[in-house]
Design a protein with these regions (language model features):
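N-terminal Lys/Arg-rich, disordered targeting/topogenic segments
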Residues: 1-18
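Membrane interfacial helix-start segments of signal peptides and signal-anchor transmembrane helices
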Residues: 17-25
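Signal peptide-directed extracytoplasmic domains
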Residues: 19-20, 38-153
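Hydrophobic membrane-insertion alpha-helices, especially the h-region
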Residues: 24-36
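Bacterial extracytoplasmic/cell-wall-associated proteins, especially those involved in peptidoglycan
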Residues: 84, 101-297
């Protein structure tokens, strides 16, 4: 009788598990090798992964409109800055003088003021722009800046003197042009209020310069003082009252001075030799004596 055969020994489960893990590792390694080869072919010889670097947005340009600048002067500043922007970036920006003049040419309805030319409402400040910024967008930002600053004013005193908000804006533009020392703004404003009260011609040289386009570097001649012009407020041939529009675009300090003049009775002022401060008086004799003493005509 042949000997009885034993059944084959079963492989332990732990061994089977290890073998399966090994086979899986081989499969993963094979897949990784194939992916590496394909990636190398697509990416060239450089097998290193290149990091993604975000592209920074171009730095905006900056345009500065000084207080008192007229609409025309702002257009000149736009032209100058646009030229710099073109030189640095190699392309013309949308912002340019001709489109700025066109965007600011027509009168608009301004809340609280009515429909007026934009001279006076183009708030002087520093504005950033890019190559895509349009003149219409810049103008809109200036008008918004004006409204924000104007909202800080209380024009109750001006209204008590029968002056409108637009009148206050006109006065502010004259204050801006006539003063170099900040502490004199309210004094110049007071002279304007007092002369309006006494039905006197304002005698503001800056209004005539604006109306006749006389540069500040040129002297005003006697014949020009007698020129019939709505912006001529001189005592020799000018009209009474305020000029028809602002003569520039005032900043917040001049707006505040126009709404809150100093409580003084001054009617005259003349620039001192330092070309920054003024001599103020309520006496015509004292005014003329000061001018004579310093060789003023």
């Amino acid at each position: 009788m042949p000997p009885r055969q034993r059944p084959p020994r079963r492989t332990p489960r732990s061994v089977v598990y290890r073998r399966r893990l090994g086979a899986l590792a081989v499969l993963v390694a094979a897949i990784a090798a194939v992916w590496f080869i394909v990636a190398s072919v697509k990416g060239g010889n450089d097998t290193k992964t290149q990091p993604t670097v975000p592209v920074a947005a171009p730095k905006p340009f900056r345009i500065v409109f000084p207080e008192g600048f007229t609409r025309a002067q702002m257009a000149q500043r736009v032209a100058a800055v646009a030229k710099i922007a073109q030189k640095e970036r190699g392309r013309k920006p949308k912002l340019k003088a001709s489109t700025y003049l066109a965007a600011t040419k027509r009168p608009r309805f301004i809340p609280g003021f009515g429909k007026h030319p934009l001279e006076g409402f183009l708030f002087p400040a520093t504005y950033d722009f890019t190559g895509r910024t349009t003149s219409a967008q810049l103008t809109k930002r200036q008008l918004q800046a004006f409204q924000r600053n104007w909202s800080q004013l209380n024009v109750a005193y001006a209204r008590s003197k029968n002056l409108t908000p637009y009148d206050v804006l006109i006065i502010a533009s004259m204050v801006e042009e006539e003063t170099a020392a900040p502490e004199e703004r309210q004094l110049v404003s007071a002279v304007i209020y007092n002369r309006l009260r006494d039905h006197m011609q304002l005698g503001i040289d800056a209004t005539l310069r604006y109306g006749l386009h006389i540069p500040p570097t040129e002297s005003i001649h006697q014949s020009q003082l007698q020129t019939p012009n709505p912006y001529n407020t001189s005592a020799l041939g000018g009209h009474f009252g305020l000029p028809p529009t602002p003569i520039g675009n005032p900043g917040l300090a001049s707006l505040q001075a126009a709404a809150h003049p100093a409580k003084v009775n001054f009617l005259y002022f003349v620039r001192k030799p330092d070309k920054k401060h003024h001599f103020f008086t309520d006496s015509l004799d004292a005014f003329n004596a000061y001018k004579a003493a310093h060789g003023y005509p």
